[in-house]
Amino acid sequence: MLKRILAGGLAVVMACSLFTGCGSSGASSSAGALTAIPEEAKKDVVSYLTDGAITSEETVMTVNGVEIPASAYFYQWAYFAGYLAYYYQGKDATDTFSLDKEINGTTYKDYLLDNTRSSLLASAIAAQKGQEQKLKLSADAKKTIDNLAESAYENTRLYYATTLKGMEFLETCSDYNDQLKAALFRKGGEYEITKETLADYRKDNVMAAKHILLLTTGKSDEEKAKIKKTIQGYLDKILADKDPASAFEQYMNEKSEDTGLATNPDGYTFLPGEMVPEFEDAVSSLKVGEIDPKIVESSYGYHLIMRIEPDMDAIDDEDLKEKYESETYQKVLDDWSKDAKVETTKALDDLDMTKVYDKLTQLQSVIQAIAQAEAAAAQAASSGSTVSE
């Protein structure tokens, strides 16, 4: 339950197919008066969402001269918004997601904009580097792009506020990204992975910790204050005990509200980027065997943390290799991007993204209802056919 909700960079964006609509959008159930897909949305979904301020095919962002169409920008933004809404409702089903709520001191609205920008920056840099190195699209990417009109249904494109042009741009960037990454890590490449490389990375990066968690999700400020006072009492008694480590274990087993405790009784072994930042930062600041003398607060609640010796075998070589590649490639992208000239249009900067989000979730709710009705009708027809036979 401590995993980060969004990882940075291009890889996460491309992990989900552009055409299948994996995951839930978290579309609002209070979807206004919409009962059908508006003709304006069918004509130009971005123009519909922005009340005519921006069209789907116009450039809204440039990176070193690489032009990013609105249909690519809003796909990325809509995808991240859906992911965040899904995460939020899973974390607190009693509350309603909105862009004005905060995560780690930042509104979801700003968090979405930052992630969309950084993701598209990585996409554009991949496109630029691909062009500079005269890369050609892979056969698989060509096939995907050639089949976009058939595989990316109109309602799927509307659902993610995109068009064939936006999808082609992102697919091209993704393919260049994959080729660039493969070249860096293959045998003889600049970052060729050896047994020694993985051994050093494992030694320097694998961490482990146990924690006592008291949840604060959905609690009022007054309730949070009481919970914090309670966990401070636990901490005081643990640190005053003649055997703090044993006392920590006892309180963890008796008081922790971490639902993962049953499957992780010996603590969590993890790599950088796999836990929420507050937890990870606290663990990395401790020595093995040390108990943090301070309460750590995250979006889940209040933690007491004890760093422990990691189980090195808990992280297999393939996971380690994947993490090393991802982290190293992100550093390469960051290096390529540090002097990038990034510009966004005034029309994009001036948008009320809360209003855009509200219109998008209304549209998504209608599309979901249509899909459910079609699925029910198809099942009914299939059942009828079976009975008649």
Please annotate each region the language model reported:
Residues S24-T55, Y159-K226, E274-E389:
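PPIase-associated folding chaperone regions across multiple families
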Residues E58-N64, E102-R117, A126-K136, G166-M167, ...:
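Second-shell loop/turn segments in exported
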Residues S17-G21:
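C-terminal motif of bacterial Sec signal peptides marking the signal peptidase cleavage site
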